Design a protein with these regions (language model features):
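Acidic, Ser/Thr-rich low-complexity intrinsically disordered segments
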Residues: 276-336
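N-terminal hydrophobic or amphipathic helices/low-complexity stretches enriched
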Residues: 1-15, 282-295
Length: 351
């Protein structure tokens, strides 16, 4: 990472943002995009940002890179971004050698207390912006409010995807992860051309044997469900995610950035189609909205509480008919619930 890139990264990291309180970040990103030559961008009603650079030739499609603009951390008056060195904690199935020391970025508030630096997903934003600066033909999407259910990307402008050939998100921790299934949605064809071509170049760029994983949810799953485009989510260098002691490996972010260039060099401006097949369940229906109607589902008694269950494309809503309270579970959490309820209620619960 060059010194100029590091300065840009630290400036981005110092911008406070939290789910539903993202105006400062969105305004900052608008100012950055305004200063980029050859880039056109716009903001939709959700405050998602869409940017395009370059003109396509005949039968070409844009590579698209995405990230999200919110973090889980509490807003503080000032985020002081500091440089340091650290070994890496165990992260999603990988333990790192204790003598493997990385240059890191971490954050303190004005009282010198640790505060979340927000690498999830400011690291992803940084990578998207740098790719926008350096690639000749590219699109990026920066989506709001991912952390509480991908609210921004669920309202993505589908016309923006009409000339996109593949989508790459940078929103996984560490430097060794690739998401293949997200919210129960497969992002690319198993053993298909897309993954067989990108996996070697990602591993070469990242310097790691990549682990394919299931991810609870992130924006790329929403785009996959709404399109016929192959998608992927890749590590972008943050550790101790969602804690005040979160930090970012500068080396891993730099490698992730290089992987973006390597992916475009390998795949070019082609389209890699992969159709999403919406799942169906016997004796159970899927609804597009999340509003309950009297005739949607049967009411049954569960542990002395009358509840209703309804499903949308991301998971299920459980509503207490006594208190009116609703909880939402994403698809990854639903399967254990189905099994538990089936065992608990035997034949009285149909799904």
């Amino acid at each position: 990472m060059t010194s100029e890139q590091l300065l840009r990264f630290k400036e981005l990291l110092s911008v406070p943002t939290k789910t539903y309180s993202e105006d400062m970040m969105v305004s900052y990103l608008e100012s950055v995009l305004n200063g980029m030559d050859g880039v056109t961008f716009w903001k939709d009603g959700m405050k998602n940002l869409y940017a395009t650079k370059g003109l396509l030739g005949e039968d070409e499609f844009y590579p698209m890179f995405i990230a999200h603009t919110d973090t889980v951390h509490q807003l503080v008056d000032q985020i002081n971004v500091l440089e340091g060195k650290s070994s890496l904690p165990p992260t999603f199935g990988k333990t790192f050698p204790s003598d493997e020391i990385h240059d890191i970025l971490y954050a303190l508030d004005n009282n010198n207390n640790p505060t979340g630096i927000g690498g999830d997903d400011k690291s992803g934003i940084f990578i998207c912006l740098e790719l926008l600066r350096t690639l000749d033909k590219v699109k990026i999407g920066l989506f709001v409010s991912e952390e509480t259910g991908c609210h921004g990307s669920s309202k993505c402008d589908l016309d923006f995807l009409s000339d996109v050939g593949y989508v790459v998100q940078y929103d996984a921790p560490g430097g060794h992860l690739i998401t293949e299934v997200c919210s129960g949605v497969r992002l690319f064809e198993n053993d298909g051309e897309f993954i067989n071509r990108v996996l070697p170049v990602i591993e070469e760029s990242m310097g790691n044997k990549m682990m394919l994983q299931s991810h609870p949810y992130t924006d790329v799953s929403q785009l996959k469900m709404k399109s016929d485009i192959s998608c992927i989510n890749i590590s972008c260098g943050y550790y101790n995610m969602h804690t005040p002691k979160e930090f970012i490996s500068i080396q891993d972010v730099d490698k992730a950035l290089k992987s973006g260039h390597a992916i475009v060099n390998e795949l070019g401006y082609n389209k890699f189609k992969y159709e999403y097949v919406k799942p169906t369940y016997p004796k159970y229906s899927l609804w597009e909205d999340t509003e309950f109607e009297d005739d949607d589902v049967d009411v049954f008694d569960f542990e002395s509480e009358n509840i209703k269950i309804k499903e949308d494309s991301d998971g299920i809503v459980i509503k207490s008919l006594i208190t009116g309270e609703e909880i939402f579970l994403y698809n990854e959490d639903c399967f254990d619930l189905y099994e538990y309820l089936q065992n608990k209620l035997s034949d009285s619960f149909e799904y």
